[in-house]
Amino acid sequence: MEPNIYQLALAALFGASFVAVSGFFMHFKALNLVLERGKERKENPDGDEPQNPTLVRRRSQVRRKVNDQYGRSPASLPDATPFTDGGGGGGGDTGRSNGHVYVDEIPPGLPRLHTPSEGRASVHGASSIRKTGSFVRPISPKSPVASASAFESVEESDDDDNLTNSEGLDASYLQANGDNEMPADANEEQISMAASSMIRSHSVSGDLHGVQPDPIAADILRKEPEQETFVRLNVPLEVPTSDEVEAYKCLQECLELRKRYVFQETVAPWEKEVISDPSTPKPNTEPFAHYPQGKSDHCFEMQDGVVHVFANKDAKEDLFPVADATAFFTDLHHVLKVIAAGNIRTLCHRRLVLLEQKFNLHLMLNADKEFLAQKSAPHRDFYNVRKVDTHVHHSACMNQKHLLRFIKSKLRKEPDEVVIFRDGTYLTLREVFESLDLTGYDLNVDLLDVHADKSTFHRFDKFNLKYNPCGQSRLREIFLKQDNLIQGRFLGEITKQVFSDLEASKYQMAEYRISIYGRKMSEWDQLASWIVNNDLYSENVVWLIQLPRLYNIYKDMGIVTSFQNILDNIFIPLFEATVDPDSHPQLHVFLKQVVGFDLVDDESKPERRPTKHMPTPAQWTNAFNPAFSYYVYYCYANLYVLNKLRESKGMTTITLRPHSGEAGDIDHLAATFLTCHSIAHGINLRKSPVLQYLYYLAQIGLAMSPLSNNSLFLDYHRNPFPVFFLRGLNVSLSTDDPLQIHLTKEPLVEEYSIAASVWKLSACDLCEIARNSVYQSGFSHALKSHWIGKDYYKRGPDGNDIHKTNVPHIRVEFRDTIWKEEMQQVYLGKAVISDEVVP
């Protein structure tokens, strides 16, 4: 009868199991013999007789028997064949000297034995020469990865000074699991590991065979960031021709003009407040508390559209003189003449292309090193570095789903709230929706119709209509206005919800732009009252004031008679609150949170280029809207004087940060080059290589919004943001209008993610852009010190803290070096560069 197939399989399984168990037993027993012999040698370092000679003799006989049967011990074990009288390692009597049993080492003539394992090139113990520090290495308590750096092994040399010759087998090496300590007399200076070279302390563990797992991941964390060397580009400065020298002198003149115009604080913020411990600043528990300060002796009056400040009523000397309109427009025309010169355009284009290629070469040589440097910074990645939304309008700060949920909740919870006065009748919220033939059930995102679509491209008027939910201006007035029948309570509540979302994210900040129209002087007090009464304060938020350029509309409506009326309505209350804070207490505390002033409207509208001799604001009584640069000058001049006055009284200052270069003429960018700290958009710089190069040299901030531009003026793939970034312009990403543009709860992260996906930005690129956004923002010196490092105001790697920014010193040093080289090129080797970044 033939055996059953299952019986054959069972027999084969039993035989294989028996062989496996036997092999394991022999392997385990041989290993134990080696380990016990090592312990005995350690316990008797001076050659004393072992305590149990019978046991030693029996072990030697077993070892000889094993070697006779199997030839040689397994490759995974150190060679431990008995020493014989004839010097051989096979049979014969066990060799003794003074009663001691010796263990044979691998003959020196044989090559090293390599037994590769996963993630390792070789197994320790194959050679009698090894680095002492590699016997037992600290590893992370969360990972079995050894701390020896894979990159240290490349950098360290194989000199004899770094090597230790171990005679025979070292029991401490065999006990790699930490049961036995390292011998105290074995090169203590090499075994000891300086604590300063470790980022964290780690527990010691390992496996029995001394085979360490792959060390790469943990090594990256153990290494101090930025210890790796990188390839520095060394491109010698070109010797300019005579034509290039003249072009460089023109660029120098433009940069010096800007220095004369832009407001700079007399005492830098880091000199006023020295931050020794950049820990989390204490939250402001009473942001709207007002303490009487009294009125100063200053006196001011408006002359030709610009406020002049005097020490007292009898004084005639202007305390804070500013360039007049004629001088400004003359200098503006000089800049326009420079940017139109053909030879200068050619030179600047060539320099910009060279900047781009230098960065590409830097990435080819150092991208991997930047990546590893980022990995070495514990805790930090793109998600938990500070990012500031440097350009976002408050009326569109929420996404469409958020607004829809809020409207539905109010319609459900407060249907009988009187919300609007229309056509001589007060209407409740329910009556408003009934008049629109809508119910809460009918509402959805599509019906809300606030999202920009194809119809808004090159149609700024249609884009503005998207601020009306369901196409109804009455819903905009109820939910998105602060000066309405309910004193903006609904807008205040949804604003608080947005603040709460920002605070929950912790690492996202915003600078919200809120409108002052200039129709009446009481607008400032109304806005400040709305902010204070609704307790709209967050450590993650500051405010900018935006002025819509709508003079022609107000003139047609009969609200104003001249442009001077708008300037009076905007700036007179600010000077009053500065000279006498008690006269406008709510405005005074609100201005502590205002960091910038913006100009907004459709830049694509045609306008006349201003001449050197323009009418004064009081003389501007025609129905046409003044040119963009006309608005810019008078806002700049009044803000300059206001900031000088506020600085003299120890108050916060307000920078000019308008929309510019989104569309329209290149003149807009020339005017903002002379007067502004940073701008929003700036995509038209792609049309002027000279202005683009000047913006690079001056490091003027550009808060760019590619998704917003994609809906209005420029397709996403044509946006110049990636080119600007490669060339080294000071760019940041912003959202502009989340209500119309974005779809997620975190619009700023959405902006970053789309840019990273489309333009293949690396993690280092994203963190550099986020760092730029903090520099451009108007947050306090204390907060910036906490967010990006206490020395953030210093140039180059000295001002970078990778543990806070996650930007490698390699990238920062490259940017700083290239910028300094360009400045020396433009100034013909005579540039005077400050060690501090101009705020």
Curated annotation (Swiss-Prot):
**Where does this chain mainly localize?**
membrane
Which residues, renumbered to this chain, carry the PTM Phosphoserine?
S134, S140, S203
Sorted keywords for this record are: Allosteric enzyme, ATP-binding, Endoplasmic reticulum, Hydrolase, Membrane, Metal-binding, Microsome, Nucleotide metabolism, Nucleotide-binding, Phosphoprotein, Transmembrane, Transmembrane helix, Zinc
Subcellular location, record wording:
Membrane; Microsome membrane
Q: Which GO terms describe its biological process?
A: embryo development ending in seed dormancy; IMP salvage
Q: Name one GO cellular component term.
A: endoplasmic reticulum
This entry's Enzyme Commission designation comes to 3.5.4.6
Q: Name one Pfam family in it.
A: AMP_deaminase
InterPro entries registered for this protein in UniProt: A/AMP_deam_AS, AMPD, Metal_Hydrolase
- MF-aspect GO terms: AMP deaminase activity; ATP binding; metal ion binding; protein histidine kinase binding
Q: What cofactor does this one take?
A: Zn(2+)
Q: Which EC class is this protein assigned?
A: hydrolase
Point to the regions of Gly residues compositional bias.
85-94
Acidic residues bias: start-end ranges = 153-162
Disordered: region residues: 40-167
- Binding-site positions, Zn(2+): H391, H393, H659, D736
Q: Is 4Fe-4S there in the keyword field?
A: no
Keyword Protein biosynthesis listed? The answer is no
Query: Which residues does UniProt mark as catalytic?
Result: H681 (proton acceptor)
Q: Where are the transmembrane segments?
A: 8-28
* Coiled-coil segments: none
What is known about regulation of its activity?
Activated by ATP. Activated by sulfate ions (in vitro). Inhibited by phosphate ions.
The subunit field of the Swiss-Prot or TrEMBL record says: Homodimer. Interacts with AHK4. Interacts with EER5.
Similarity comment text for this entry: Belongs to the metallo-dependent hydrolases superfamily. Adenosine and AMP deaminases family.
What name does UniProt use for this protein?
AMP deaminase
Classification of source organism: Eukaryota, Viridiplantae, Streptophyta, Embryophyta, Tracheophyta
